[in-house]
């Protein structure tokens, strides 16, 4: 018989750096999950990813307090900031431009995020990523 789902917990955790401190501890502690077990499993699964990159994770908690989790790709904004070599986006993206990304970089990010995005094709996903870049104050060059 299938296990009964008790809750879904969505978090963003730095790759390879999950520990019982907030936000992981309180979110999983409320559901009665073994926090250290999750931290070890998450860190093992994300060891191939650049350390410190925020990784969205969806944890499915079952009624017997067991869990499974699915990791997603890093947010587009984080990948764009990394590609442009900037710390943060612009506070006034329509006036102040803070950096530049090439259309090749945008396409590469779209291909990286293809598994998580619901776009019809890479071109549509590239346009979506380019829109995110513009809203952060980045200039997309051809």
UniProtKB/Swiss-Prot annotation:
One of its GO terms (biological process) is translation. CDD domains: Ribosomal_L11. It comes from the Bacteria. Keywords: Methylation, Ribonucleoprotein, Ribosomal protein, RNA-binding, rRNA-binding. One or more lysine residues are methylated. NCBIfam families: L11_bact. This is Large ribosomal subunit protein uL11. It comes from Sodalis glossinidius (strain morsitans). The lineage of its organism: Bacteria, Pseudomonadati, Pseudomonadota, Gammaproteobacteria, Enterobacterales.
